[in-house]
UniProtKB/Swiss-Prot annotation:
One of its GO terms (cellular component) is extracellular space. It is found in: Secreted. This is Putative gastrointestinal growth factor xP1. Pfam families: Trefoil. Residues 30-73 form the P-type domain. Stomach mucosa. Keywords: Disulfide bond, Growth factor, Secreted, Signal. Disulfide bonds join 32-58, 42-57, 52-69. GO terms for biological process: maintenance of gastrointestinal epithelium. May act as a growth factor. The gene is p1. One of its GO terms (molecular function) is growth factor activity.
Amino acid sequence: MNYKVFCLVAIALIVGSIGSANGQAAFTEEQCSVERLARVNCGYSGITPQECTKQGCCFDSTIQDAPWCFYPRATPEY
């Protein structure tokens, strides 16, 4: 009986940690479409997409000679 409870708690913790990135919601495509010259580096050389998004940043490795991990575009306040 205790083993079943332990397994359920472990599964809940794993699913919960996978579903959240340090409380950061995923950014929209618009927020992460930042021009090459306007990108402000948010990571380090060799950072993985997972590490980058965990830091609350955008990751895009399709543009050469630009930071791949960078701060998202600020959202306008209404």
